[in-house]
């Protein structure tokens, strides 16, 4: 009897445990954030894992400076020399107190821009690149559109409040996605302290300190894997923050914008943990991998992945991705090895969720020709060719006979 009761209890507890595990096997609920706009984006695929008013424009304050940093890295060498003009020393807010006529390296101004959030450094870089703040703002907006930003308008390089200076959480994430690819940006953005050496206008060193607590190991907000971030604040713009972090090849970008509370460090850590704990980056194909074969009538070739292909999936999701290959007759077109000739939609097979498009190329050349036909068409062509050849030969024979008769007639006449 006791043995039967014990067996029943073991079975009952096992049943409860299994069902509890099944019930709990779901993605954690995303954290709440106090900012009015927020996003969590995978940097590799651009997939959005969390969103809150991501397309609503807000004043971004000093998070603007990631665009200034991007344009500086794209247009300058770190050792280039900048001669400060009249206007930058007059910039309001946070500054390192540069002087008109002072000569500084681009590298030093970038450190001042990203660590001290120096508004005067931002304006000095802008004038160095474009000649004026107005022209640099045009360059900022042009580059933003190229990156896919749709609700952004910059009017200055530092984020000082202006009624028309606006961007969104999603647009900031796209800019951060681009600038964080630069090794120099990551190095500067992760530096805790830096000193600008004396210049022609300053006899003392200028010490700089990083304001980003996610890279400070003694901070309670320290986040291992953080590879860059930028804070922003003005009274009208409120608090903003943009940050990127990675675990292995999995890299996430979090943006918080227009936050009346100073909780952006805590909220960003919660967002990043939510992303890394619940999702994973899958590399499905590497560039050059044979994806599948194409076999149609007289054409057979390998279809090759044009680029590395990644997708994001929930960790608890057991499904694997499947390919939905574009239907296209390749016999009728000419192409060269390496040309993109087909694409495939990548779907998660449990819910047909489209996770991306894979571009496919050929592993060899293919030329369309009248000599490359199926058997039926070849027979028709051969028959037509023979008929025309016979007609041609008969015409020649007749022509020669006629010519011969004429010669004989002429000979007889003379």
Predicted regions and their residues:
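Sec-dependent N-terminal signal peptides of Gram-positive bacterial secreted proteins and lipoproteins
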Residues: 2-25, 380-400
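Generic detector of low-complexity/intrinsically disordered segments
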Residues: 7-11, 15, 162, 301-305
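A generic structural signal for short, solvent-exposed coil/turn residues
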Residues: 17, 30-32, 74-76, 90, ...
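Active-site-adjacent loops and short helices of periplasmic peptidoglycan-processing enzymes
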Residues: 23-191, 198
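Domain-terminus/edge residues, biased toward the C-terminal soluble/receptor-binding domains
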Residues: 149-150, 164-166, 171, 176-414
């Amino acid at each position: 009897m006791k043995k039967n009761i014990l067996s029943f209890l073991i079975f009952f507890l096992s049943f409860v445990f299994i069902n509890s595990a099944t019930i709990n096997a779901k993605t954690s609920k995303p954290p709440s954030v106090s900012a009015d706009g927020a996003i969590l984006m995978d940097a590799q695929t651009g997939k959005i894992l969390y969103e809150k008013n991501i397309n609503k424009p807000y004043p971004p304050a000093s998070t603007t400076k990631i665009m200034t940093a991007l344009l500086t890295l794209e247009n300058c060498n770190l050792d280039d020399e900048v001669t400060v003009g009249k206007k930058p020393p007059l910039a309001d807010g946070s500054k390192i107190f540069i002087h008109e006529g002072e000569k500084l390296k681009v590298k030093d101004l970038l450190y001042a821009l990203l660590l001290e959030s120096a508004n005067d450094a931002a304006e000095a870089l802008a004038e160095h690149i474009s000649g004026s703040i107005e022209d640099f703002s045009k360059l900022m907006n042009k580059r933003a559109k190229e990156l896919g930003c749709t609700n952004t308008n910059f009017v200055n390089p530092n984020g000082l409040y202006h009624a028309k200076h606006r961007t969104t959480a999603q647009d900031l994430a796209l800019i951060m996605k681009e600038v964080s690819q630069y090794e120099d940006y990551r190095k500067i953005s992760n530096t805790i302290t830096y000193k600008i050496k004396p210049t022609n206008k300053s006899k003392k060193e200028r010490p700089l300190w990083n304001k980003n607590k996610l890279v400070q190991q003694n901070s309670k907000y320290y986040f291992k894997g953080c590879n860059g971030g930028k804070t922003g604040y003005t009274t009208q713009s409120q608090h903003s923050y943009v940050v990127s972090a990675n675990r292995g090849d999995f890299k996430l970008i979090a943006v918080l914008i227009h936050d009346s509370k100073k909780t952006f460090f805590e909220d960003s850590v919660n967002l990043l943990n939510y992303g890394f704990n619940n999702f994973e980056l899958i590399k499905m194909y590497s560039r050059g991998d044979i994806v599948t074969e194409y076999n149609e009538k007289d054409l057979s070739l390998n279809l090759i992945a044009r680029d590395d292909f990644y997708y994001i999936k929930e960790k608890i999701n057991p499904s694997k991705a499947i390919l939905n290959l574009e239907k296209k007759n390749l016999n009728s077109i000419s192409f060269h090895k390496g040309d993109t000739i087909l694409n495939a939609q990548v779907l998660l097979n449990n819910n047909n969720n489209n996770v991306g498009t894979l571009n496919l190329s050929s592993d060899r050349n293919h030329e369309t020709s009248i000599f490359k036909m199926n058997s039926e068409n070849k027979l028709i062509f051969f028959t037509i060719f023979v008929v025309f050849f016979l007609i041609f030969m008969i015409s020649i024979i007749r022509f020669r006979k006629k010519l011969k008769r004429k010669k004989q007639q002429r000979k007889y006449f003379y």
